[in-house]
Regions:
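Residue-level detector of buried hydrophobic side-chain packing
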Residues: 41, 64, 74-76, 99, ...
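Sec-dependent, cleavable N-terminal signal peptides
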Residues: 1-36
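Acidic Gly/Asp/Thr-rich repetitive segments characteristic of extracellular carbohydrate-active
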Residues: 43-77, 81-83, 90
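Right-handed parallel beta-helix/beta-spiral solenoid domain characteristic of secreted/periplasmic
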Residues: 97-177, 581-592
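C-terminal accessory segments
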Residues: 128-141, 145-149, 153-156, 579-651
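Low-complexity, Pro/Thr/Ser/Gly/Ala-rich linker/spacer regions in secreted
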Residues: 28-37, 650-667
Length: 667
């Protein structure tokens, strides 16, 4: 076990069970149903008859369901309705039958109902001794005695089975299977009812406290709320199992709890979520959502203030490859992965925000381990915190990041923005680390890890050591088109600190305006041999070694501009090994004090680099402009065939116009 070994929560394939579902809806689709009879139900209705004609003939809801046939509607009067007298009783949905709540008991048209004003409650409190708020159980601790195992059930029904406008409460699935699952609703064997305008409150089960969907059950949920439901195992709000793929739109999971998946638990389930909120849910792992061998799709989803005692405050993924677009993780907390935790998982994140999430151990925003390889594009990490990796922590994992920002994240120990550990090899393109803080590696920390950085900016990061980047224990990152500016360290390495046989390779990198006690630009300690080609180190500050400082380390430097190293003609061997082509001259930045590290037309760094050092496939600079651009009238002092690459992260793009004199001749 290493010093930061994670413990994978019990249960990567833990779920056998039957499923339950809950939902809230607006109006049911009518074109798919043939016109039929309107049947009426009331809390103290008749137990015989056809329940039709008028409200005067209203039956119990159980009776109305029994006599209804495909094409019928059941209008249900406000009040509390119970499924029967025994624990196995449940309201069973039927194909082609639409059940509507929210009636006062006088309406002649369905459009006259108001399900929010006229609360229609389906309750499992068959012994009528629960503590309720107007008939609704608001916490499962208020369930007393023995309630119905399932308030609602469906087996092999399709979308024409409709439930619309109800509170579902007080289900208590604490028996043996199948009565252990789906306290509020239990959907089984390819059941896919339509569920609208529903609130599931105070239901309990071993699995799927609010709803359980099992064996290909894929209900459609619109305007549904799951609140204060609990599961002693998995899925406090909802559990989806064995190819169950419900579709959720405008759904809220709030205050639900479980051992795993406080809001939702998916095991071989692939739900689609649009405009869904997970808020204030809790679990040992996966406070908001827990996925096992599942591939849910999330669009416009918010996970906020969810909590996990172990992994994944907002979400935990195990062997799962989900897709997230326009998703926000905010204020979630856990031991590992405050926002998201991935184990053996490869989610795709696009336009996702992680803000103010916290982890006690690693990964305030995201924690990746066990060879996880998520893909992130247009993602922002802001204000997240952890012991290791305030924004992101990777353990033996290699995510791919494009157009990502780490801003204002913090770590107590390593990696304010990102911490890489145990042979992690992330790839970063067009990434910015700004104003992150840590003890080691304000922007990034690498331990026995070798990320690849292309077009990356480190600016105004702070640390005790290594303001911008910390590399230790055989870490060999590759950097191309990277800037380190205005980073600071109290002790060593304002821009970069390399320690214990770490040898990064830097090509077209600029260090300027960084500060530290020792090694303002770069500090190399304990047998480090970094390679620098086409690099500028100028205008940094430290009491000892303002630009560059080596302790028992020998960098290899060529075609670079390092202040104080003398250039290749009068090389200072304390700087490292002279590979030729080096200069020691003011690079003439456009405005270094303002952070503009582009080159003025008179810069000696223009056309002074080495073409052969630029890796294949790198054709642009940090601005996205051509990497090889010739500036007319500037001598090529570098190595290669014109156009010669510039030193530093930015390629000068100047062009000159030649104006010929105007000659006027008289005729």
């Amino acid at each position: 076990m290493n010093k930061r070994t994670r413990c994978l929560v019990a249960g990567t394939a833990l779920l056998i069970g039957v499923s339950m579902a809950l939902a809230l809806i607006l109006t049911a689709p009518q074109s798919a149903r043939a016109a039929g009879t309107v049947r009426y139900a009331a809390p103290n209705g008749l137990t015989t008859g056809n329940c039709d004609g008028s409200w005067a003939n209203a039956c119990t809801l159980q009776r109305a369901l029994a006599v209804a046939v495909s094409g019928d509607e059941i209008w249900v009067k406000e009040g509390v309705h119970y499924p029967g007298a025994t624990r196995t009783a449940a309201f069973a949905l039927k194909n082609g039958v639409a059940v509507y709540g929210g009636f006062a008991g006088t309406e002649t048209q369905r459009s006259q109902r108001n399900w929010q004003t006229h609360r229609t409650i389906l309750s499992g409190d068959i012994d009528k001794n629960d503590i309720t708020d107007g008939g609704v159980v608001t916490t499962t601790a208020n369930i007393k005695g023995s309630n119905a195992y399932h308030v609602i059930s469906s087996t092999n029904v399709i979308s024409t089975a409709v439930l619309d406008g109800f509170f579902i409460t007080a289900g208590q699935a604490n028996g043996s299977w199948p009565h252990s699952d789906g306290g509020g609703m239990y959907n089984y064997k390819n059941s896919s009812p339509t569920l609208m305008n529903l609130t599931f409150s105070g239901n309990a089960a071993a699995k799927g406290g609010g709803m359980l969907n099992n064996n290909g059950s894929s209900p459609t949920l619109m305007s549904v709320t799951f609140i204060s439901n609990t599961a002693t195992a998995n899925g406090g709000g909802m559990l989806n199992y064995l190819n169950s793929s419900p579709v959720l739109t405008n759904v809220t999971f709030s205050g639900n709890s479980a051992v795993n998946g406080g809001g939702m638990f998916n095991n071989i389930g692939n739900p689609t979520l649009t405009n869904v909120t997970f808020s204030g849910n809790s679990a040992d792992s996966g406070g908001g959502m827990y996925n096992v061998e599942s591939s849910p799709t999330l669009m416009g989803v918010t996970l906020s203030s969810n909590k996990a005692n172990g992994d994944g405050g907002g979400m935990f993924n195990d062997y799962s490859d989900l897709t997230l677009t326009n998703v926000t993780f905010s204020g979630n907390s856990a031991e590992y992965g405050g926002g998201m935790c991935n184990a053996h998982s490869n989610p795709t994140l696009t336009s996702v925000t992680f803000i103010s999430n916290t982890a006690i151990a690693s990964g305030g925003g995201i924690f990746n381990y066990d060879d996880s390889r998520p893909t992130l594009a247009e993602v922002t990490f802001s204000g997240n915190s952890a012991d290791y990796g305030g924004g992101m922590s990777n353990e033996n994992s290699s995510p791919t990041l494009t157009n990502v920002t780490f801003r204002g994240n913090s770590a107590v120990t390593n990696g304010g923005g990102m911490d890489n550990y145990a042979d992690s090899r992330p790839t970063l393109t067009n990434v910015t680390f700004s104003a992150n803080t840590a003890d080691y590696g304000g922007g990034m920390s690498n331990e026995n890890s070798s990320p690849t950085l292309i077009n990356v900016t480190f600016i105004r990061n702070t640390a005790g050591n290594a303001g911008g980047m910390f590399n230790e224990s055989y870490s060999n990152p590759t950097l191309m088109n990277v800037t380190f500016s205005s980073n600071s360290a109290i002790a060593d390495g304002g821009g970069m600190y390399n320690h214990l046989s770490s040898s990064p390779v830097l090509t077209d990198v600029t260090f300027s305006g960084n500060s530290a006690g020792k090694g303002g630009g770069m500090y190399n300690n304990n047998v480090c041999t970094p390679t620098l080609v086409n690099v500028i180190v100028w205008g940094n500050n430290a009491a000892t070694g303002p630009e560059f400082l080596n302790n028992n380390s020998t960098p290899r430097i060529s075609y670079s501009d390092i202040r104080g190293c003398g250039g290749s003609g009068s090389w200072n061997s304390a700087c490292g090994t002279n590979g030729g082509g080096n200069i020691d001259a003011d690079p003439r930045f456009v405005n270094a004090s303002a952070g503009n590290l582009r080159l003025l037309p008179t810069s000696p760094c223009i056309d002074a680099g080495k073409n052969g050092a630029v890796p294949a496939g790198i054709t642009t600079d940090l601005d996205g402009r051509p990497r090889f651009a010739d500036v007319p009238f500037v001598p090529d002092t570098g190595n290669g065939t014109s156009p010669i690459v510039d030193m530093g992260a930015y390629e000068a793009q100047y062009r000159y116009r030649v104006f010929l004199p105007l000659v006027v001749r008289n005729r």
